[in-house]
């Protein structure tokens, strides 16, 4: 409840100011408040209440009680002021709500339009994509159904769709999918009556080559003997040469060329080396009875650090001291040994460097010399 403001006036003689009048249940007294601000309405209402109170006091008897109309009219005027203020506040709130609702409606409508536009674009794109995918899938399925197998045909005319005789091209498929109706079983295939006839020609050629090699060896006077069948002095050397023949077949060819007689022409030697296969030479034994067995010291005397050219000793020089003589036409064998050279003292030669003193030119004055120094 709003506090009741009462304006006091000077006391009159024989009268008493009633600050708290008692309510009267008689005829209601209305005090209308004009529309306007709060303060103006309150001041207007209070002034009217005070005037009515004075009139009632003057009109009434001095001994009787004051009329309670003043309190009732004051309360009603206050209630009306409050109701008017409430209505104004409600109007302002309703106006604000309407403005915010309009703004929200506008923003929501614009957003809905944007969303609807985006959804329309997205829907159109997705529909176009789905339509293209379905078309391509249908074309692919129709292409697969037109051919029974995914493999290509051998002829290049299979892409010619205007060709009416497409069934003719179905006959030429890949080798993996050939028609098995024309296939022949392996059991019914024609077989060779004599398979050995195929291999007989190759075996005969091999025997002819073998005979030729034997004849060439016989012409060169190489006697095929048993292994290690030489004299007692050259047993070890013969065994070593036979082992070398088994491991590396190219070395005995060179030894045969050197040990054979020099009277035979060179063409026969070349024919022997080229015609005889390496696998056949391992079965032959070279007669090494005429080869001298010499010690390492006799062959290579005075070998300490390195070998000079004067120390290379030919085998023919040892022919006088040996008991077994070489044949007259035997070729000389020279042996050269490569060893690491010994350490040699290297003399350090001193290099003399001539130093010249720097001398200034004669034309330079003395003060410049001092600055430079």
Swiss-Prot record:
KW DNA damage (keyword) present: no
GO CC annotations on file: condensed chromosome, centromeric region; kinetochore
InterPro entries: Meikin
GO annotation, biological process: female meiosis chromosome segregation; homologous chromosome segregation; male meiosis chromosome segregation; meiotic sister chromatid cohesion involved in meiosis I; meiotic sister chromatid cohesion, centromeric
Biased composition (Basic and acidic residues): 77-91
Main localisation: nucleus
Subunit structure: Interacts with CENPC. Interacts with PLK1; required for recruitment of PLK1 at kinetochores.
Coiled coil: none
Region ranges (Required for localization to kinetochores): 332-335
Region (Disordered): 1-91, 250-276
Chain positions of motif POLO box domain (PBD)-binding: 275-277
Its biological purpose: Key regulator of kinetochore function during meiosis I: required both for mono-orientation of kinetochores on sister chromosomes and protection of centromeric cohesin from separase-mediated cleavage. Acts by facilitating kinetochore mono-orientation during meiosis I, when kinetochores on sister chromosomes face the same direction and are thus captured and pulled by spindle fibers from the same pole. Also required to prevent cleavage of cohesin at centromeres during meiosis I, possibly by acting as a regulator of the shugoshin-dependent protection pathway.
Subcellular localization, as worded in the UniProt entry: Chromosome, Centromere; Chromosome, Centromere, Kinetochore
Name of this chain's protein: Meiosis-specific kinetochore protein
Keyword annotations from UniProtKB, A to Z: Centromere, Chromosome, Chromosome partition, Kinetochore, Meiosis
């Amino acid at each position: 409840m709003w506090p009741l403001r009462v304006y006091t006036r000077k006391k009159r003689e024989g009268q008493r100011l009633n600050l708290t009048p008692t309510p009267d249940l008689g005829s209601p007294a209305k005090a209308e408040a004009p529309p306007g601000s709060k303060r103006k309405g309150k001041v207007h209402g209070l002034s009217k209440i005070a005037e009515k109170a004075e009139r009632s006091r003057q009109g009434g008897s001095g001994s009787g009680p004051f009329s309670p109309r003043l309190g009732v009219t004051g309360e009603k005027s206050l209630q009306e002021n409050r109701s008017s203020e409430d209505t104004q506040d409600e109007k302002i709130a309703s106006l604000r709500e309407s403005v915010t609702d309009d703004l929200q409606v506008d923003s929501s409508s614009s957003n809905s339009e944007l969303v609807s536009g985006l959804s329309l674009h997205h829907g159109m794109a997705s529909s176009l994509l789905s339509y293209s995918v379905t078309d391509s899938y249908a074309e692919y399925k129709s292409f697969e159904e037109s051919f029974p197998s995914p493999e290509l045909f051998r002829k290049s005319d299979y892409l010619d769709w205007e060709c009416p005789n497409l069934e003719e091209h179905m006959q030429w498929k890949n080798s993996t999918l050939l028609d098995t109706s024309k296939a022949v079983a392996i059991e019914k295939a024609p077989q060779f009556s004599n398979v050995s006839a195929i291999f007989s020609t190759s075996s005969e050629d091999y025997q002819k080559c073998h005979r030729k090699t034997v004849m060439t060896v016989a012409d060169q006077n190489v006697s095929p003997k048993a292994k290690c069948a030489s004299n007692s002095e050259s047993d070890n050397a013969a065994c070593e040469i036979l082992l070398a023949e088994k491991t590396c077949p190219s070395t005995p060819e060179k030894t045969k060329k050197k040990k054979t007689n020099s009277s035979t022409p060179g063409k026969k030697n070349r024919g022997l080396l080229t015609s005889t296969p390496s696998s056949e030479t391992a079965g032959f034994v070279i007669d090494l009875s005429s080869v001298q067995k010499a010690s390492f010291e006799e062959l290579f005397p005075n070998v300490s650090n390195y070998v000079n050219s004067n120390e290379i000793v030919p085998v023919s020089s040892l022919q006088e001291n040996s008991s077994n003589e070489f044949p007259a036409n035997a070729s000389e064998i020279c042996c050269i040994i490569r060893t690491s050279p010994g350490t040699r003292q290297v003399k350090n030669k001193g290099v003399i460097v001539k130093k010249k003193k720097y001398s200034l030119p004669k034309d330079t004055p003395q003060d410049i010399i001092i600055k430079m120094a």
